[in-house]
A protein has these predicted regions:
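Phosphodiester-processing cores and adjacent nucleic acid-binding clamps
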Residues: 1-324
Length: 324
């Protein structure tokens, strides 16, 4: 049996993540963990560093992001390079919908088999109607099945029933917010400070408002550590259900290809320029014209003149700074 941490938040998840990419890589090397995900909330800023570090340390990197869809938290994992590009588009659309609190609607999501979606159940259980609509868009959808303490008993029973009713497979997860088992207290302090709460205030886990985790088990676990945890703490989950959730965890890892990104100056990916365009600038200008035809072409001439001036100035700035 192999277990992989499929939901991992780094310090790029400013409000909730505490572990750094370097710390996670270090733990993987110490514990012999061969696969690692990065699924920050509303952020893919750490992806390039993550891929580089994983490749240098012979770790299979799984690229992901956690987004809100119809008020449900969902972790998306890229199965391939096309899935990576789809995740970038979904993240962009979510910020277009609301910059302060990004979200997606099911209509924002196109039908795809390039990504895996893990619907969170730890904080809020999805409705059957939502699952039905969402599964019409994404081929590979799983329900999060976590064994962590807190209200696990009620959650596991309810999620199991939901899985059976909707024919949605369960996948075992260990939501990871920090790298080391000794970092729980610092993680709690970090979450409280960012949201301007005192540690003396009642946490959400006890009906209060202070952000907090349900338990001190949210660190990066090896397969053996998970096995030990299950043996010592989990007696209320049928073995058949638990074993299948573990099998599904490995099945997800197996279906995911290693995403490879080429770099320029060690910083950014090389864009794909479709024919007949010769370079990124000509392609970019064509995209601008496409947007112009959709948005500006029917507007009054004085508006068009103002837009042309603005586009010209911004294009000069973009090009002079070598952004394309």
């Amino acid at each position: 049996m192999e277990f992989s941490n499929l939901i991992v938040y780094s310090d790029y998840s400013v409000h909730i993540g505490y572990g750094t990419i370097d710390e996670y890589i270090s733990v993987c090397k110490q514990k012999g963990i061969k696969t690692l995900s990065l699924t920050d909330t509303n952020s893919m800023m750490g992806i390039f560093k993550f891929l580089t570090k994983c490749k240098a340390n012979d770790i299979k990197a799984i690229v992901g992001v956690t987004l809100t869809v119809e008020k449900h938290n969902i972790t998306f994992l890229a199965k391939n390079i096309n899935g990576y590009h789809e995740l970038c588009k979904l993240l962009t659309q979510s910020t277009r919908n609301n910059l302060d609190e990004p979200f997606l609607t099911t209509t924002d999501i196109k039908q795809t088999d390039n990504i895996v979606a893990i619907v969170h159940t730890y904080e809020k259980e999805p409705t059957e109607q939502f699952l039905s609509e969402f599964k019409n868009k994404v081929k590979d959808v799983y329900l999060e099945f976590t064994l962590l303490k807190g209200n696990r008993r009620n959650i596991s029973q309810s999620v199991t029933r939901l899985s059976e009713r909707t024919n949605t497979p369960l996948v075992l997860t260990n939501p990871t917010f920090y790298a080391y088992d000794t970092d729980f207290e610092m993680s709690e302090i970090n979450m409280a400070l960012i949201k301007n709460y005192s540690l003396q205030e009642t946490p959400v886990t006890r009906g209060g408002l202070r952000p907090a985790l349900f338990c001190n088990e949210h660190y990066l676990k090896s397969t053996q550590e998970l096995v030990n945890y299950v043996k010592g703490n989990v007696t209320d989950v049928p073995k058949q259900i638990l074993n299948q959730a573990i099998i599904n965890n490995q099945s997800i890892v197996d279906m995911i290809e290693q995403v490879e990104l080429e770099y320029q100056l060690g910083l950014r990916p090389v864009p794909h320029i479709p024919a007949p365009f010769q370079d990124s600038l000509s392609y970019f200008k064509a995209l601008i014209q496409e947007g112009w035809d959709k948005i500006v072409a029917d507007k009054p001439k004085e508006v068009q003149a103002e837009w042309k001036k603005r586009i010209k100035n911004e294009l000069e700035v973009i090009h002079s700074n070598d952004f394309i």
